[in-house]
Amino acid sequence: MEKIIEEQAQDLEEACRDVPDVEVIHSGSGFEGLSLPQLIHGQTWNTDADHMIIKTSLKLQEVVKPEETGGERNIEEDQHVVRGKGSFTDAETDIAENVLFIYDASHAGYVHLSNKRPLFPTDSDSVREHCLQNSKFIDSSRKSVPFSHLYMRSKEGSIVGPSYSIQYTTGSFNVDRDFVYGLKCEQWPLQANEWILRDRPQSWPGFEQISAISDQGCHVVPVGSHMSHLREFEWRFSFSAAELILARSLADDQKLAYSVLKALIKSEMKSRDADVFASYHLKTCLFWLLEKRGINSWNKQSLGTNVLELLNFLIGFYDEGFVPSYFIGKNNMIDHRSPEDILKTCHALREIRDSVTQSFCRYIQYNQVLPVLFDTSLTQQLKKNPTKFLQNCKYNFLVMALAYILRPIKMVQMNISSRCLESAASLMKKAEILHKATREAGSQEYKELLSALSDALTPVENPTTNMVLSLLEEFLATDKMKVTESSAVALAVFNVFLALHPSHLHQGSETNPLEFHGYLVNPIFKDCFLWAAKVHERYCDAIYNFVVKKWVGGPHLITTDQEATKFMKLLMVILGKPTKQAGAVTGSLFRSSNEGQMFLLTRFLADYLLHVHLECAYVTFQATAFLMNKSVLSEIYLTINWGTYKPSQLRAIELVLSKQELQAELSEEDFTKLIKKQHELKTELSTG
């Protein structure tokens, strides 16, 4: 998701490169790392990104009344002082056409812009006569900055206030993009001086960060206050660039607490009659909380504690009917909402707080992010069978730990390896705690259990796939679960393998073939799929028998190899989809539906298995042939004739030559060509 957002940002910058006097500022949760992608329509992941288009040809200079600078006010002229680089101190000086003066509006956080000398009184008539109307600026900006060619993969956009919103779709991801036009204030505004000067007992943000933020100034965007009768002539200060700096300075745990709470609130508010909440309020609340409490205290607390503390802090703001802007504390961002609406939102947030575990369960169910899916939902388990709920969590922790161990190998990113292993170790310990709790029913109170889970940071040293698989096997043997639940665990392990197993499409296959081959045949991936096949046959053979009996016209996969037979049974269950978990085997860690793509998954799988288990590869080619309504030989020949990775081509030839039933389909000429190609490939690989 991050890569997609960055690519879109680069596309926008490229589009603006030939447009004179334009600068692009990127912000929003997608760039700040402050979001959990939301699943929409059960199919596509969704996040957001904001883009501010800055017209750099216009220069802004702030006007300061004498009483604000210690001088005496001339009531007759309402004389103003101009502040900023190249300030005009002589009222008779000609004003450049590209200079706009900033005058405070009636509401904190908002201003008027005018190209007139700073002499006129800022009453309503003067504002209407002399100040820039924000809608005219928006119209002229849209004409001068053509972005239409960026919307080719977007749904039709909509105009909401000062912004233009589109939904950009690519593959399995949607990005809600908001474009807003604005102007740059080179100097930090006087209205926000209090942010620089206020006392910070916890020293967050630090002096250097405050200086860096204030030195870069801010922006104004063409939107007026809801409380103003001059709204069309007002502009709002925007501190998006400053917020981006602050957000990116946060630790991952702090970002996660905010992201989880935002996701929960947005998900839960859909079914409630309360519309005051805005995610920007929560981000503002996060900054206020960190400033008052300090970031060190948050680093020492569990995720659940941080989420609840942030939620209580937010409720406190709404309770007071005052959500202060972080940079301009006098600006109450909800003063235009009725007390009744604010009260409804307070009530809704308290309900979420009082049932936060259920809210979280509903969120992860809706977004289909659990790798292991039991027959009953998490919320039902939590209400009716807490032991089953803990059991479900335990297996999900272990399967997620497995994914954390495999992911750095798949991504070949050593910089994330240590973090992933720490997460895997923590999840494994949590699973052990939950296993003990379910075996000793009633021995731990719920709060004690949560405390034990939050303390399980990195107690397992050097976690490995074998350690995870051994724990899973031990727990399955003692838990004696339903057949469908044991099947869910085995299939979830296989799905993690399917999502992360090596592929010849990896970028190192040509540049460093020896290193890539070592990665390709790494035994930990083979261990995972063979474990899943073995366990599924041991506990869930009844499901395979059900599929074979009920699937009229289904595939007839054949093999005489013992390990491949177990794998064949697992593959039949995946193709037959008799359970919810079988339907969720999509080769993705993040989605539960991938209709029409199974033939691609089996083709990539077959290509990988050629290198680690030839007989399992043969079974998979049979499955692909069934899905494509082709012969098995023709599917293997696709790899032989069109494959781009020579070792795969060679192994595919070896597979054909190892099977009499496949050789029988070859003409004498085809057989001769196959032997010749085998010789050529061996020669190329030995000399290369």
Swiss-Prot record:
Catalytic reaction annotation: GTP + ATP = 2',3'-cGAMP + 2 diphosphate; GTP + ATP = pppGp(2'-5')A + diphosphate; pppGp(2'-5')A = 2',3'-cGAMP + diphosphate
Pfam families referenced in this protein's UniProt entry, alphabetically: Mab-21, Mab-21_C
GO MF annotations in UniProt: 2',3'-cyclic GMP-AMP synthase activity; ATP binding; GTP binding; metal ion binding
EC code: 2.7.7.86
Gene Ontology terms: biological process: innate immune response
Keywords for the protein's UniProt record, in alphabetical order: ATP-binding, GTP-binding, Immunity, Innate immunity, Magnesium, Manganese, Metal-binding, Nucleotide-binding, Nucleotidyltransferase, Transferase
EC primary class: transferase
Residues reported to bind Mn(2+): 290-291
Residues binding GTP: 176, 178, 236-243
Coiled coil: none
Residues that, per the record, bind Mg(2+): 48, 176, 178
Chain sites annotated for binding ATP: 29, 240-243, 262, 279-283
Cofactor dependency: Mg(2+); Mn(2+)
InterPro entries tied to this protein: Mab-21-like_nuc_Trfase (IPR046903), Mab-21_HhH/H2TH-like (IPR046906), MAB21L/cGLR (IPR024810)
The family this protein is said to belong to: Belongs to the mab-21 family.
Function: Nucleotidyltransferase that catalyzes the formation of cyclic GMP-AMP (2',3'-cGAMP) from ATP and GTP and plays a key role in innate immunity. Directly binds some unknown ligand, activating the nucleotidyltransferase activity, leading to synthesis of 2',3'-cGAMP, a second messenger that binds to and activates Sting, thereby triggering the immune response via activation of the NF-kappa-B transcription factor.
PANTHER family the record matches: CELL FATE DETERMINING PROTEIN MAB21-RELATED, CYCLIC GMP-AMP SYNTHASE-LIKE PROTEIN-RELATED
Protein name: Cyclic GMP-AMP synthase-like receptor 2
Gene coding for it: cGLR2
